[in-house]
Amino acid sequence: MCREADLSEALEAGGCDLETVRNIIQGRPVPCDLRTKVWKIALNVSGKGDSLASWDGSLDLQEQPLIHRDCQNLIDRLSVAEERKTALLEDIESVVTFYCKSRNVKYQEDASWIHLLNPLVGLQLPRSDLYNCFYAIMNKYIPRDCNRKGKPFHLFRLLLQYHEPELCSFLDTKKITPDLYALNWFGSLFAFHCSVEVTQAIWDNYLQQADPFFMYFLMLIMLVNSKETVLGQDMDDKEELIKCLENTPSSLEVEDIEDLFSLAQYYYSKTPASFRKDHQSLFGSSLIAFKDDTDLSQALCLAVSVSEILQANQQQGDGVRFFVVDCRPAEQYNSGHLSTAFHLDSDLMLQNPGEFALSVKSLLEAQKQSIESGSIAGGEHLCFMGSGRDEEDMYINMVLAHFLQKNKEYISIAKGGFMALQQHLADFNMENGYGHWIVSTSGSHSSISMYADGDSAVAADDGKGMKSLVNKMTVAFKTKSVNVKDKVISFIENTATPVDRITFNIPWPERASLERHVSSSDRVGKPYRGVKPVFSIGDEEEYDTDEVDSSSMSDDDRKEIVNVQTWINKPDVKHHFPCDEVKDNGHRFPSHLLVTATHMYCLREILSKKGFAYIQSRQALSTVVKITSKKKHPELITFKYGSSNASGVEISAVERYLIPNAGDATKAIKQQIMKVLDALES
């Protein structure tokens, strides 16, 4: 059991937030008598008013008989005292009816989401709290389009294929799609199939995660555990197999939940962050879904953003690491490619199958060697990159299918291909060029030349190199306060004398490990190697991507809300710095940095709720490895967090803040970090 006395005391004291609850519980079971308060905090409904107060209570929907029947069936299945049944039925039917009316939802027969009330009923909540909890769960944890052939289930199939291609292929041949067996899993968060006790144990952990995407990994474990049974049984009856899969959660016991979450966390850590970041619009409270034209039903495999690929190339240690396979024709690859990419010409698959087979064999051997040698190019996860133009990428899908048919796990495609990679680097490094990110077989690095309106772009050679590879792109960008005119960016091979520019301090693969990945002029450096696990302060010279950020999701859907002044006045807060949080896209959010003896918190102000903020970030001071500032903008401070190991430092997060009097702020933070490090060393 958790420290029940500490938890009870914290809850009684008031002002308790989810972070405090997590720190006390630390993954252990929630005491039954405290579950109500813990869940209300986790769902952000503590102290919320009665949403039904303005409703006249009319149960007059066209589908009301259907709602009444399903609510009655729900009550009959629960262990409820006879004298409570009538009042409870009224509460449940009112909650369902008001939800349908307020959200303009037409109730469907046997809707799986009605079973979300099963574990809530056991808490014996008043009607207002019952509705608030139900509403919060529906908005935050039940995805849009959670129905037959819905987008959430197409995404789940891609996740299953990523980790268990053999099982996915088997189910595909049977034409068994995830919506046929997992609709009630997702629609009820397992409440449809599991007992109330088991469901409450699952929700105790799940609500503390505060991440709706974690449900995907709990569902994945359901299938992983059923794999041997599904593949081993000779079931010709499709419906029988679907029923077998659908009932998998029914066998769960309370004692299984700890292992369930441990396994889910493992698969979560082995999945590209793009899985979550690129599909945030599946969840949220907005009545109008974010515009997302991605047709996941036609996707051959998971897509990974180029920003994540670049960040993975910088990291060391555990985590998702990509072995990038460039599938463009040889002349395009030779003109310029990601420095760590292996070349596999997809055209060979039809033009010269024998040579293609040899190339695949070489690819797998190179991948193995790069992992064993600890090369920066090494990674278990194969990510295939095309040009980004449909007419040029006709064969890359055939290459992907080739690997998937061999049940190769961890297969993905670079979203937008090489064009997206170039555009991403251009957007973030227009003044400084590509540095060592993109190389050519001649050893010269591609760079970006910018020309003002009306100027013509003249290549450094007679049209060869990067200019012949890609079209000119027009990009618009902003400075701090002035809109700069559109510039035409011409990508050319830089054969002239290199200009002075900031280079990227990125360790490249050892030449001996993967000869074809690097050119003879690439430098080899291993920053941080042999350095003590302490942070450094200096001018910002490195390329960063804020891949850990999750702000693209509605904050209302995943962040806990706190009172800013209450947090500032906490006795353990040593420093408070008003600031703006700055994202890679230039967006700024009024925020507050709070420094305690051991941690730094970022509270992002809620513009629509004065005096309150979301806990946007919480970082241990012991994990700060570097603090940098821009020469031209010294008030723009970048914090890098990570952990050290035998081979160096692995960067786990990057945050940027615009801080008035930044010098005083960084000095105070530095002093507190030194105290933490001194304490750790002693």
Curated annotation (Swiss-Prot):
* UniProt-listed SMART domains: TBC
Q: Which UniProt keywords apply?
A: Cytoplasmic vesicle, Developmental protein, Golgi apparatus
Its subcellular locations are: Golgi apparatus, trans-Golgi network; Cytoplasmic vesicle
- Rab-GAP TBC domain span: 29-210
Q: What is its main location?
A: Golgi
Using the record's annotation, list all stretches that form the Rhodanese domain.
318-426
Q: Which PROSITE patterns match?
A: RHODANESE_3 (PS50206), TBC_RABGAP (PS50086)
Enumerate the InterPro entries for this protein: Rab-GAP-TBC_dom, Rab-GAP_TBC_sf, Rhodanese-like_dom, Rhodanese-like_dom_sf, TBC1D23, TBC1D23_C
Q: Which Pfam families match?
A: RabGAP-TBC, Rhodanese, TBC1D23_C
User: Which GO biological process annotations does it have?
Assistant: embryonic brain development; retrograde transport, endosome to Golgi; vesicle tethering to Golgi
For whether the record's keyword set contains Zinc, the answer is no
Any one GO CC term of this protein is: cytoplasmic vesicle
Database matches in Gene3D superfamilies: Rhodanese-like domain, Ypt/Rab-GAP domain of gyp1p, domain 3
**Function, as annotated:** Putative Rab GTPase-activating protein which plays a role in vesicular trafficking. Involved in endosome-to-Golgi trafficking. Acts as a bridging protein by binding simultaneously to golgins, located at the trans-Golgi, and to the WASH complex, located on endosome-derived vesicles. Plays a role in brain development. May act as a general inhibitor of innate immunity signaling.
Supply the name of the protein: TBC1 domain family member 23
Species, as recorded: Xenopus laevis
Taxonomic path: Eukaryota, Metazoa, Chordata, Craniata, Vertebrata
- Give the gene symbol: tbc1d23
